[in-house]
Curated annotation (Swiss-Prot):
Pfam families: Ribosomal_L18p. The keyword Ribosomal protein applies. InterPro entries: Ribosomal_uL18_bac-type, Ribosomal_uL18_bac/euk. This is Large ribosomal subunit protein uL18. Keywords: Ribonucleoprotein, Ribosomal protein, RNA-binding, rRNA-binding. One of its GO terms (cellular component) is cytosolic large ribosomal subunit. One of its GO terms (biological process) is translation. The gene is rplR. Coiled coil: none annotated. This is one of the proteins that bind and probably mediate the attachment of the 5S RNA into the large ribosomal subunit, where it forms part of the central protuberance. The keyword Hydrolase does not apply. One of its GO terms (molecular function) is structural constituent of ribosome.
Amino acid sequence: MAKISRKLQTQKRHKRLRRYLIGNKIRPRLAVFRSNNHIYAQVIDDDAQQTICSASTVDKELKEDSDKLSPNCSSSTIVGKLLAKRAIKKGIKQVIFDRGGNLYHGRVKALADAARDAGLNF
């Protein structure tokens, strides 16, 4: 029997998780996507099918700090703080965390902890 690739395992986990994680206007979903070089996070209202705010390592605000942004936990921390700041500015304090099928470890955990420290509740 062939071994299932790590990417396929992540996709299967994400499919299972999305059955239960549904964001609405009062408590939107904080979705995280992790690539090899970057990390992306969005606050999404699933009822209206609309992205409320987003942040990533390729953001314009973070371009001047591009030498510091490498694919590690410190850049995920910066993105988490930026996303929380933008969400609070739009009046969102509570979210549902969607780790996107990734394990809650490393860069995903660093982003979540930074968003919590900056004022988001989940």
